[in-house]
C-alpha cells in the first residue's frame, strides 16, 4: 500500500476527517483538508517531518506509513529476495500451492528476539480473545 493510501487508511481507522487530521497536523484550518486530500490522492508527498507529525496524530509508527508497497508483484518479489538474502526465506511447492517459509533464528541475546517473542504473545492473546483485532492492530501499527 502506498503512502497516500496508508494515510487515508489510518485516518479512516481513527474516524477522522481530512480537515480534522490536517488541523491537528498544524495546517491552517482553511487549507487543512486540501493538504491532506493532496497527500491522499498522491498529488503531493509529505516531507519526512510532516509524515512524522501525521503518524503522531494518527497514533501509528512512521514506519507503518512507509512500509514497502507490496501490492506490486515485482516490489513484493524483491522484498522476498531481501528476506531470502538476510533471513533465509525458503520456497516450497505442494501441488498447486507455493509456500514461503521464513524461520528467523533470533537468539535470546539479540535485539530482534524480544520483539518477535512479544509479537507471538500478542498473536496468542488475539487468538484466545484476550484482546480484540483493533487492540492488536493498535499495538502492531504503533511499533517504532
Summary of predicted features, one role per range:
Residues 7, 18-22, 33-39, 54, ...:
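Conserved hydrophobic/aromatic packing and binding residues within compact polymer-binding modules
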Residues 1-14:
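A short, Lys/Arg-rich alpha-helix, primarily the initiator
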Residues 26-46, 67-71:
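Recognition helix of helix-turn-helix/homeodomain-like DNA-binding domains
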Amino acid at each position: 500500500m502506498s503512502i497516500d493510501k496508508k494515510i487515508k487508511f489510518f485516518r479512516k481507522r481513527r474516524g477522522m476527517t481530512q480537515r480534522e487530521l490536517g488541523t491537528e497536523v498544524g495546517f491552517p484550518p482553511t487549507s487543512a483538508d486540501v493538504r491532506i486530500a493532496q497527500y491522499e490522492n498522491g498529488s503531493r508527498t509529505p516531507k519526512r517531518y510532516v509524515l512524522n507529525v501525521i503518524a503522531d496524530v494518527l497514533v501509528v509508527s512512521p514506519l507503518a506509513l512507509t512500509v514497502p508497497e507490496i501490492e506490486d508483484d515485482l516490489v513484493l518479489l524483491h522484498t522476498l529476495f531481501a528476506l531470502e538474502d538476510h533471513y533465509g526465506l525458503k520456497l516450497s511447492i505442494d501441488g498447486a500451492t507455493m509456500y514461503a517459509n521464513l524461520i528467523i533464528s533470533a537468539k535470546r541475546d539479540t535485539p530482534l528476539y524480544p520483539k518477535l517473542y512479544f509479537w507471538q504473545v500478542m498473536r496468542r492473546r488475539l487468538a484466545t480473545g484476550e484482546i480484540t483485532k483493533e487492540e492488536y492492530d493498535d499495538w502492531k501499527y504503533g511499533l517504532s
